[in-house]
Design a protein with these regions (language model features):
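N-terminal ligand-binding/catalytic initiation module
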Residues: 1-158, 399, 406, 432-456, ...
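Adenosine-phosphate binding glycine-rich loop
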Residues: 2, 161-162, 178-184, 285-393, ...
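Glycine-rich adenosine-cofactor-binding loop
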Residues: 66-78, 83, 167-171, 181-207
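Anion-binding alpha/beta catalytic cores of soluble intermediary-metabolism enzymes, centered on
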Residues: 85, 137-184, 407-410, 417-759
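A short, aliphatic-rich alpha-helical micro-motif
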Residues: 127, 185, 253-254, 274-277, ...
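NAD(P)-binding Rossmann-fold cofactor-contacting core
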Residues: 193, 209-237
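Rossmann-like adenosine-cofactor binding region
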Residues: 235-305, 311-313
């Protein structure tokens, strides 16, 4: 590596604190009672329960979500036998990947022991601590013996990722590659370069899926592995030794091969060898950092080749992070006693199937303009595909249950998948009541920026989840082109409707209706006609007004207030309401917080604040949450009589009269709103109990500042909204930073609102 990269890597590992992992408590330790519960004397209670029933350890300790990454440093990736201590940064890195991709906690354990039996004894003795063991960077052939003996001795999963992780991903790639070139696994011939742990595991898995052993030829550093080549050949190699036909080199056996599997070293495969391979050959050149052959060189001589490498700068990266976090997730969640062949094969099929699915928006944004539709350049998913956990973990868990190694079977797989989805989409639990209602009676929702990539991704999700009947406004040719480019599987006229914003036969009716609404607001017929042609928000609003759609989402492009001005002009306020307001939800580790008014009213009056607070409470109830409202101010329960504080006090009295059942108090400081003890010091008899979840600000400035500070300062927080309240129709104006998931969430909310709209 160059000097700049080397120094950057060293700085990354040293600052702000050395290393990449830490231990964080999951329980509060703020009081003497907390300490008494966490340690002596309270800790005796779970100890005694575990003594009576060892499975209780999964209930009272972190064991069920804790994996050991264990190595002796004899085969550290790309570095060789550098020793246990020198390999520690790699093991920490593995732990970070477990946590990042599957939420699994890891202790990295570096064992300074080269004797396999002694190493086995050390690892086996650690069984009470962990829910699973990930063996890492242990050289062959010792790794086979170590894994086998540990699997025999231990009643928790033991998984050597260097073997099985590579095998699972490679096998998934081969299955999909064969599908692309229309070849049968039982007929193809494969040549393998390398006979280490990964190569042997790959071959074993492929044979389990139907590849014929007699169609596999293996070459190691001494050439072709044939029977009786040498005395005392390792059993793992001997299992794939072929009859001696006089061929000794890779060049001798590559002629006519359908697949080349490289688990060896750089530049092993030449262009001349590639030329001799069969029609549409598959080349898996997995040596790192330099593969057996670089993809451009292979493509020069065989444009029909499908190529995989271990590198991220070429298509079809075979990366173990595609499987090991999710295999362990599934295994841990059912208390598996092993990771068996059935579980590995389940992972293979889940990974292979995901490559056929529509493109994920997260992956699309991470990989730019790459075409990620299933085909020669995309036969395995990308490592950052958020759907990996919800596809692989359940498949592995079910395989564990079906094969009899699960000690804690999952009773409700739908609920389990929902729980895994929360890891991908932090809003999933929050939105669950809304999604459930939306699915019962999906409504027609017009999305006014239908050509936007985020809107198209959202449309795919809406159809997949069954939440709405989307109507997209945009040019049909552009929408179709972008659907193809994004690798989506939705079809116009089948999954969604398109309204062509350049020419629709209804436009004369639309602009005529828009003119009737706007004619006494300074808009001429000509201006109304231009507005319909130029402004998709106007088109969408008129569609909802005419009953051609039930709800509308706009604002992913452009200024919020320009969109809102159209919404306000076309729809006006709902019955009994004289103002509109906007509210944003922040889903923080400390709880859900709603802030209003973030977008509509610059300086609301007491009457407007009262309406906004009552509407906010109504909206929060839709999420199954009891509203607790605090009116915020620099004044704390009458400490100031300035106009702003007086306004909040006046709003409180209006709210009490209009919604006496509402739990609300004010005016108060922000800390008093969120911390009951602080509030009680100043106002012991406050009707507001616990932490407020709706914060009504004195003006838009305070609301927007507070919202953005909380949004940015909480790295774990996610947002929903803005939710538009008080408009006569179910309409929400989003902002240009809206993610795909936020669009989906707001469409679902609009559907639920439309379900309760009077006809």
């Amino acid at each position: 590596m160059d000097d700049q990269l080397r120094q950057s890597a060293l700085d990354f590992h040293e600052f702000p604190v050395p290393g990449k992992i830490q231990v964080s408590p999951t329980k509060p330790l703020a009081t003497q009672r907390d300490l008494a519960l966490a340690y002596s004397p309270g800790v005796a209670a779970p100890c005694l329960e575990i003594e009576k029933d060892p499975l209780a350890a999964y209930k009272y300790t972190a064991r069920g979500n804790l994996v050991a990454v264990i190595s002796n440093g004899t085969a550290v990736l790309g570095l060789g036998n550098i020793g246990a201590l020198a390999g520690k940064p790699v093991m920490e890195g593995k732990g970070v990947l477990f946590k990042k991709f599957a939420g699994i906690d890891v202790f990295d354990i570096e064992v300074d022991e080269l004797d396999p039996d002694k190493f086995i004894n050390v690892v086996a003795a650690l069984e009470p601590t962990f829910g699973g063991i990930n063996l890492e960077d242990i050289k062959a052939p010792e790794c086979f013996y170590i894994e086998q003996k540990l699997r025999e001795r231990m009643n928790i999963p033991v998984f050597h990722d260097d073997q099985h992780g590579t095998a699972i991903i490679s096998t998934a790639a081969i299955l999909n590659g064969l599908r692309v070139v229309e070849k049968n696994i039982s007929d193809v011939r494969m040549v393998v370069s390398g006979a280490g742990a990964a190569a042997i595991a790959c071959m074993n898995l492929l044979v389990a899926l139907g590849m014929q052993k007699h169609n596999i030829v293996v070459c190691d550093s001494k050439g072709v592995i044939y029977k009786d080549r040498e005395p005392n050949m390792a059993e793992t190699k001997a299992a794939y030794a072929v009859e001696d036909d006089g061929k000794r080199t890779l060049d001798d056996v590559i002629d006519g091969a359908d697949i080349f599997l490289g688990c060896s070293g750089p530049k092993v495969l030449s262009q001349e060898m590639v030329k001799k391979m069969a029609r549409a050959p598959m080349i898996l050149a997995l040596a790192n950092p330099e593969p057996e052959i670089l993809p451009p060189l292979a493509k020069e001589v065989r444009s029909d080749a499908i190529i995989c490498t271990g590198r991220s700068d070429y298509p079809n990266q075979v990366n173990n992070v595609l499987c090991f976090p999710f295999i362990f997730r599934g295994a841990l969640d059912v208390g598996a006693t092993a990771i068996n062949e059935e579980m590995k094969l389940a992972a293979v099929h889940a990974i292979a199937e995901l490559a056929h699915a529509e493109q994920s928006e997260v992956v699309a944004s991470a990989y730019g303009d790459q075409d990620l539709s299933f085909g020669p350049e995309y036969i395995i998913p990308k490592p950052f595909d958020p759907r990996l956990i919800v596809k692989i973990a359940p498949a592995v868990a079910k395989a564990a249950m079906d094969s009899g190694v699960a000690t804690r079977p999952i009773a409700d797989f739908d609920a389990y998948i929902d729980k895994l989805s929360e890891f991908v989409y932090k809003t999933n639990l929050f939105m669950k009541p809304i999604f459930s209602l939306a699915r019962k009676a999906p409504k027609r929702v017009v999305l006014t920026e239908g050509e936007e990539a985020r809107v198209l991704h959202a449309t795919q999700e809406l159809i997949t989840l069954g939440l709405a009947k989307p109507i997209l406004i945009g040019r049909p040719s552009v929408i179709e082109m972008r659907i193809q480019k994004l690798g989506l599987q939705i079809k116009a006229g089948v999954d969604f409707e398109i309204v062509n914003n350049e020419s629709d036969p209804r436009f004369k009716e639309y602009w005529s209706e828009y003119y009737q609404i706007m004619k006494r607001r300074g808009i001429t017929q000509e201006q109304a006609q231009r507005a319909v042609i130029a402004n998709t928000t106007v088109i969408g609003a008129i569609m909802v007004q005419r009953g051609e759609a039930d709800a509308m989402i706009c604002g992913t492009i452009g200024d919020y207030h320009e969109h809102f001005s159209v919404v306000k002009a076309v729809f006006g306020h709902r019955d009994g309401v004289h103002t509109a307001g906007a509210m944003n939800a922040l889903l923080l580790p400390s709880g859900n917080t709603f802030i209003a008014d973030t977008y509509v009213n610059d300086d609301p009056t007491p009457d407007q604040l009262a309406e906004i607070a009552v509407m906010a409470a109504e909206t929060v109830r839709r999420f199954g949450i009891e509203p607790k409202v605090a009116l915020l101010s620099h004044s704390n329960f009458g400490s100031s009589n300035c106009p702003s504080a007086s306004k909040m006090r006046a709003a409180l009295e209006l709210i009490k009269a209009r919604a006496p059942e509402l739990m609300i108090d004010g005016e108060m400081h922000g800390d008093a709103a969120l911390v009951e003890s602080i509030r009680n010091d100043r106002m012991p008899d406050s009707p507001l109990k616990g932490s407020a979840n709706i914060l009504v600000m004195p003006n838009m400035e305070a609301a927007r500042i507070s919202y953005n500070l909380l949004r940015v300062s909480s790295s774990e927080g996610v947002t929903v909204g803005p939710v538009l309240m008080g408009v006569a129709k179910p309409v929400h104006v989003l902002t240009p930073i809206a993610s795909v998931r936020r669009i989906v969430n707001m469409v679902a909310l609009a559907v639920v609102e439309a379900q309760t709209q009077p006809l």
